[in-house]
Amino acid sequence: MIVFPNAKINLGLQVVAKRADGYHNIETVFYPIPLTDALEIEVREDTCDRLSVHGVPIDAATEDNLVMKAVMALRRKFDFPPLTIELIKHIPSGAGLGGGSSNASFMLKLVRDYFSLPIDDEELAAIALTIGADCPFFVGNRPVLATDLGQVFTPLPNFSLSGLHIAIVKPPIHINTAAAYKGLKHVGKRETMPDEIVYMPVEEWRGKLVNDFEESLFPEHPRLAELKEMLYRSGALYAAMSGSGSALFGLFREKPQLDKAAITDCFRWQSIIP
């Protein structure tokens, strides 16, 4: 049985408060996009699970892979046979696209459906939350306003980017998330929340729908700012960094012709949003 875990983008990201526990509360819109990995399972005649990962390299030992953490989380509640697991990675890691979290949540759903486990999406989302703050998003996989640590979701009725073209570029730059939070120049609520701005025409988002990480990370990594401007030069209605990076995305009316010389060393992907 095979599924295709998809990525997400952040539409705006406001860091609204630093908490007493050292973490930060955020306000952001999560939107699913059709950039996918592939995840397949079958029962194996053995005493333990086996995970094989192919495609885009990921920097994690097998036991630390979120797919395996998802399997073990379900094993604590249900009894099911050992699995052979094949994960083919297309979503780059360390990009702000939620690839690892998506893999974990899709693994939960895949095992649930494969073995007809008696657990609904709400219970599955609760398990997903123990793996990562944004993992529950991929259980429902619909546009939401994410608040608190990014795990409290408010649906966004009638909000859709369907029909727009999207381009993603990720340079070979690694962003340490903890360091990115530490370097923030703005922490606090802004006048307008992301879920209000996204209902405006996309052409009006520029300058309003802000990712707070850009202010601190762009001076440190000028290449990120250059790529964002390249997306605008290529005709983007809106362009931004996703999460704490280092992937950037642009939204377009027509299929864009990107500056190939500017992205020769980048991961790049384009599609139409369904």
Curated annotation (Swiss-Prot):
Keyword vocabulary terms for this entry: ATP-binding, Isoprene biosynthesis, Kinase, Nucleotide-binding, Transferase
Top-level division of the source organism's lineage: Bacteria
Recorded metabolic or biological pathway in which this protein acts: Isoprenoid biosynthesis; isopentenyl diphosphate biosynthesis via DXP pathway; isopentenyl diphosphate from 1-deoxy-D-xylulose 5-phosphate: step 3/6
Enzyme Commission number: 2.7.1.148
Keyword Lipid metabolism: no
GO MF annotation: an example: ATP binding
Residues binding ATP: P92, S93, G94, A95, G96, L97, G98, G99, G100, S101, S102
EC top class, as a word: transferase
Active site location: K8, D134
Reaction(s) the record says it catalyses: 4-CDP-2-C-methyl-D-erythritol + ATP = 4-CDP-2-C-methyl-D-erythritol 2-phosphate + ADP + H(+)
Pfam families, A to Z: GHMP_kinases_C, GHMP_kinases_N
A GO biological-process term: terpenoid biosynthetic process
Record has Nucleotide-binding as a keyword: yes
Family classification: Belongs to the GHMP kinase family. IspE subfamily.
Function: Catalyzes the phosphorylation of the position 2 hydroxy group of 4-diphosphocytidyl-2C-methyl-D-erythritol.
NCBIfam families: ispE (TIGR00154)
Listed name of the protein: 4-diphosphocytidyl-2-C-methyl-D-erythritol kinase
Organism: Porphyromonas gingivalis (strain ATCC BAA-308 / W83)
Lineage: Bacteria, Pseudomonadati, Bacteroidota, Bacteroidia, Bacteroidales
Gene: ispE
